[in-house]
Amino acid sequence: MREHKLVVPYTGKERRVRVLLPKNYEKDTDRTYPVVYFHDGQNVFYSKESYVGHSWKIIPAIKRNPDISRMIVVAIDNDGLGRMNEYAAWKFQESNIPGQQFGGKGVEYAEFVMEVVKPFIDENYRTKSDRKHTAMVGSSLGGNITQFIGLEYQDQIGCLGVFSSANWLHQEAFDRYIERKKLLPDQRIFIYVGTEEADDTDKTLMAGNIKQAYIDSSLRYYHDLIAGG
C-alpha cells in the first residue's frame, strides 16, 4: 500500500490518500487497471483506524474473492469534524442541535476528488482512466457524496456503490437536484440499505424514526433513478 498527502484547495491542508495496488502490479508493467475510489478512507482497510470501530476490510475481502477483477483501490480520508460538511452538497434540513448548521461543502469536496485526486492517481499509476473503469463507493454520508459526485460527474464515473444513504439530511434539495439532471442510462449503480441503520450521531440530527429514514432515502434514490431513465 502506498500513501500520499494531497493538498485540499479550499482548506490549504494536506489530506491522506492511500492506494492499494493489485497483486503483481510491479511485475505486470504493461497492464492497466480499473480504479475504485472510497470515501471515509479511515474505514476502508483497518478497524483500528475506523471512527465507527469497524472497517470495510477490503484487503481480506479481495483475498477471499480471487475471481474479482484486479483493481486499484483509492481510499480518501474524511476530514474528521469537517466530515458532515464535506460529504453534503447542501445544508442539512434536519438538525436537533440549536444554532448548528451542517453540510454545504460537498461541491468543493467533489472538485478536490475529481480535479486533484483522480488526475494524480491517473498520472502516477497505470489506470484505466475512462468512465467505464472508474467507480466510487461510500456509506451513510459517504453514500450521499457518492450519489452527488456520481451525478455531477456522470461523464467520468461509470459505477457507483451507495450504501446506507443518509439523504434524509437534505432530502428536498437532493430531490430537486436529481430532477434537473439528465441521467446517463448506462451508469451502473448498486444500492444497499439495512433495517438497523443509525448511530448516536444520527440521533442528534433527527428526532424521528431514523432506521426508516435510511430505508426511505434509498428507496427514493432508486425511484428517482428509474424515473430519470
Residue ranges and their predicted role:
Residues 1-229:
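Non-catalytic cap/lid and distal C-terminal segments of serine-dependent acyl enzymes
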